[in-house]
């Protein structure tokens, strides 16, 4: 069970690595994120939020999901399971509207970095490059299960 925010953040980051990869493979961007939290009494809660702009970045998705988690989860009980979903998917070539306060150069630089990381992972394997925090003892199963929904979609 996860007992504090410091244990939850690496799990969010690990889960969003796969989300970012799948978004790139399917040429989609997420315009929102949803989290599903189940505590050790098996009580579940789900929340969702919109992102500032559509993205494929695992880090931006993880940060948005974690901000939502910190805002909504009250820590009555330890967490048994966490699910993160990219929602409101749009094609990756959809024009994005920026505002006056966005640092578009920083965003583009981060997107290029994410693309480079994705290229390295495709060439040398998905664990060839990782965030340093993910090398600590993650409180999640080593093997993630792949669930096939009745519609044929993979989760």
Where are these regions (language model features)?
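Basic, low-complexity intrinsically disordered segments
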Residues: 1-155
């Amino acid at each position: 069970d996860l007992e504090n925010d410091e244990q939850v953040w690496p799990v969010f980051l690990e889960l969003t690595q796969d989300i970012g990869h799948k978004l790139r493979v399917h040429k989609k961007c997420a315009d929102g994120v949803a989290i599903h939290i189940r505590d050790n009494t098996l009580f579940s809660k789900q929340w969702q939020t919109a992102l500032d702009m559509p993205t494929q970045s695992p880090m931006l998705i993880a940060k948005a999901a974690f901000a939502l988690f910190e805002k909504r989860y009250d820590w009555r009980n330890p967490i048994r399971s966490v699910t993160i979903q990219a929602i409101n998917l749009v094609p990756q070539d959809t024009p994005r509207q920026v505002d006056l306060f966005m640092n578009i150069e920083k965003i583009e630089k981060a997107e290029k970095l994410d693309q480079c990381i994705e290229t390295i992972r495709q060439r040398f394997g998905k664990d060839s490059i990782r965030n340093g925090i993910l090398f600590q003892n993650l409180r999640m199963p080593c093997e993630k299960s792949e669930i096939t929904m009745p519609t044929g979609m993979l989760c």
